[in-house]
From Swiss-Prot:
Subunit structure: Heterotetramer of 2 PyrK and 2 PyrD type B subunits.
Gene Ontology BP terms: 'de novo' UMP biosynthetic process
Cofactor binding, per record: Binds 1 [2Fe-2S] cluster per subunit.
Record-given protein name: Dihydroorotate dehydrogenase B (NAD(+)), electron transfer subunit
Residues in FAD-binding FR-type domain copies: 2-101
Keyword Zinc found: no
Gene: pyrK
HAMAP family: DHODB_Fe_S_bind (MF_01211)
GO terms assigned for molecular function: 2 iron, 2 sulfur cluster binding; electron transfer activity; flavin adenine dinucleotide binding; metal ion binding; oxidoreductase activity
List of residues binding [2Fe-2S] cluster: 220, 225, 228, 244
Positions of FAD binding: 52-55, 69-71, 76-77
Family: Belongs to the PyrK family.
Keywords: 2Fe-2S, Electron transport, FAD, Flavoprotein, Iron, Iron-sulfur, Metal-binding, Pyrimidine biosynthesis, Transport
Entries under Pfam families matching the protein: DHODB_Fe-S_bind, FAD_binding_6, NAD_binding_1
Length: 257
């Protein structure tokens, strides 16, 4: 159930160039699942007006804390980056349908593919898959080394490959270069990132079960404004879906790419 709460800042730190890790404390954490997101009001003033959708990177229900990782590049997220321990942040959430962690049986293997700021939600997903006895393989793509993050955290959960467009870290090129050269064996894949990457994955693994998390610009975050609609394929009855309320995670092949 979506609720609004003023959550307390536990910590905030910069972990890469313009990339921030923000941990908040509050009751909303108890309802969160991997792949969902929250809509954050970055300031108590009227400007910026719209909330910012940010994915959930880590969930700690024992301590009522969750972590977001975001890029501070626009006016709103730059304001959010000024928050310090003890301050409050107005959060609406959790929103959307997350990743189905039960899609992989115990003893199976999941391939997790992320690109840029689509990487964070895969961290909590990998944690929960590991807890169910599932092996995880991570292929994570970034533009350059200076914007890479969470290498130790992902490596602690499973086999991890980093890819950068300029070759400054890991394999040079795109995530598909690693998938071609390594040809990992797996049962189900999960992915979050830019549309070209998601489209490439669908073409790469036409026979595999997969789940894609979409990154779309959003206005309201609750399905009222229709700012984030995507056209569907003929696999489902709807002509269009809303990424915020119907997604952001969809089974492979249901959204037209």
């Amino acid at each position: 159930m979506i609720r609004q709460e003023k959550m307390r800042v536990v910590s905030q730190k910069q972990i890469a160039t313009n990339i921030f890790e923000l941990t908040l404390h509050g009751e909303l954490v108890q309802d969160m699942t991997p792949g969902q997101f929250v809509h954050v009001k970055v300031s108590d003033s009227l400007e910026p007006l719209l909330r910012r959708p940010i994915s959930i990177a880590n969930i700690d229900k024992d301590n009522n804390e969750f972590t977001m990782i975001y890029r501070a590049e626009g006016r709103g997220t730059k304001v959010l980056a000024t928050n310090r321990e003890g301050q409050q942040v107005n959060v609406l959430g959790p929103i959307g349908n997350g990743f189905p962690v039960d899609a992989v049986k115990e003893g199976g293997t999941a391939l997790l593919v992320g690109g840029g700021i689509g990487v964070p939600p895969l961290h909590e997903l990998s944690k929960q898959l590991n807890a169910r006895g599932v092996k995880t393989i991570h292929v994570l793509g970034f533009q350059t080394e200076d914007v890479c993050f969470y290498e130790e955290e992902f490596s602690a959960l499973g086999e991890t490959h980093y890819v950068t467009v300029d070759g400054s870290k890991g394999t040079k090129g795109f995530v598909t270069n690693v998938l071609e050269s390594r040809a990992p064996e797996f049962d189900v894949f999960y992915s979050c990132g830019p549309l070209p990457m998601l489209k490439a994955l669908e073409g790469f693994y036409p026979e595999k079960e997969g789940y894609l998390s979409f990154e779309e610009r959003m206005g309201c975050g609750i399905g009222a404004c229709f700012a984030c609609v995507c056209k569907t394929t003929d696999q489902i009855a709807k002509d269009y879906v809303k990424v915020c309320s119907d997604g952001p995670v969809f089974p492979k092949g249901t959204v037209a790419l």
